[in-house]
């Protein structure tokens, strides 16, 4: 383990593990994502840390359920992280 550590140029892996406020440039851990319903294949935009149950617009199946942090996707649902 080296004693000299470059604080101005941390590796991307180190930055990801840090708290969102203690990073070199602050950035949130949350994101929006497109979730595809396994039944009717409609796409719904869902927040990653959703605090309520999200239902499909077309067939009213449950797409994700809240946990203490990130929302848990239902089995069979596929998602894609939205670009900002």
From Swiss-Prot:
Component of the small ribosomal subunit. Part of the small subunit (SSU) processome, composed of more than 70 proteins and the RNA chaperone small nucleolar RNA (snoRNA) U3. One of its GO terms (cellular component) is nucleolus. PANTHER family: 40S RIBOSOMAL PROTEIN S27. The keyword Zinc applies. GO terms for biological process: ribosomal small subunit assembly; ribosomal small subunit biogenesis; translation. Binds 1 zinc ion per subunit. This is Small ribosomal subunit protein eS27. Belongs to the eukaryotic ribosomal protein eS27 family. Pfam families: Ribosomal_S27e. GO terms for molecular function: RNA binding; structural constituent of ribosome; zinc ion binding. A zinc finger (C4-type) spans 37-59. Keywords: Cytoplasm, Metal-binding, Nucleus, Ribonucleoprotein, Ribosomal protein, Zinc, Zinc-finger. It is found in: Cytoplasm; Nucleus, Nucleolus. Residues 1-23 are annotated as: Disordered. InterPro entries: Ribosomal_eS27 (IPR000592), Ribosomal_eS27_Zn-bd_dom_sf (IPR023407), Ribosomal_zn-bd (IPR011332). The keyword Metal-binding applies. Component of the small ribosomal subunit. The ribosome is a large ribonucleoprotein complex responsible for the synthesis of proteins in the cell. Required for proper rRNA processing and maturation of 18S rRNAs. Part of the small subunit (SSU) processome, first precursor of the small eukaryotic ribosomal subunit. Residues 1-16 have a biased composition (Basic and acidic residues). Its cofactor is Zn(2+). The gene is rps27.
């Amino acid at each position: 383990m080296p004693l000299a550590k470059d604080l101005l140029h941390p590796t991307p892996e180190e930055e990801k593990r840090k708290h969102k406020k203690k990073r070199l440039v602050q950035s949130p851990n949350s994101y929006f994502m497109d979730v595809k319903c396994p039944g009717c294949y409609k796409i719904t935009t869902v927040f990653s840390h959703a605090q309520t149950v999200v239902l499909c617009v077309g067939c009213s199946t449950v797409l994700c359920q809240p946990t203490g942090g990130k929302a848990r996707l239902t089995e069979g649902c596929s998602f894609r992280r939205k670009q900002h």
